[in-house]
Amino acid sequence: GTYALATVSKINNMDELTEEIIQKGSTHFLEMSGGDINATELVATLINQKDNLIEGIRYAQERIDGALTLLLLTPDGLYCARDKLGRTPVVIGRKEDGYCAVFESCSYLNLEYEDDRELGPGEIAVLTPEGVKTLVAPGKDMRICTFLWIYYGYPSARYEDVSVEEMRYHCGMAMAERDGF
C-alpha cells in the first residue's frame, strides 16, 4: 500500500543492500545530488519486500547493519518503530483528542501534548485517534546513543527521562573538576 516514511538511520551496509536489490531487478533508486542513494528510499524498498508492514519493518531492521528508527504513516495509523538496540528514540505524546510520535520530546511541547511514553528497543507500535497499540514488544538490550545528550539533542529534550540540559551541565561540572576549576 501507500505510505509516507521518515527515518533516522545509520546504515553501514548500504552499498551491499543497494547492490543486492538492484541485482534482483525489483526496483530502481533515485540518486541524491552527491550520487548517493537516499537511505529512506532503501528502507522503503526493504519494507516492501515483505507481505505486510510489520514483517517489512522487522525485515529492514534485521537486514540493516547499524541503526534504524522510523515513523510510517498510512490511512490506518502512524506506525512507529524504534531501533532494535534503542539507539535513537521514539517518543509518544498525548492530549485529549489524540496522539503524536516524534524523535525528540521537545517537538510537541508548544502543541499542548504531554509525554505518554518512549518506545523500548525494537518496539513497534501503531497510533490511531483511539490510542496506542504495541504490535512488537520491546527488547531488553538498550544501547542509546550518548551523543544525544552531549551533542545532537536539543537542550529542552529528554531521553529515557534524562534531561539534555542537566546532562550537559553535569558533564561541564565533571570536566571543570578534572581540570582543577
What are these regions (language model features)?
Residues 1-121, 126-181:
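Conserved short alpha-helical segments that host acidic/polar catalytic motifs at enzyme active sites
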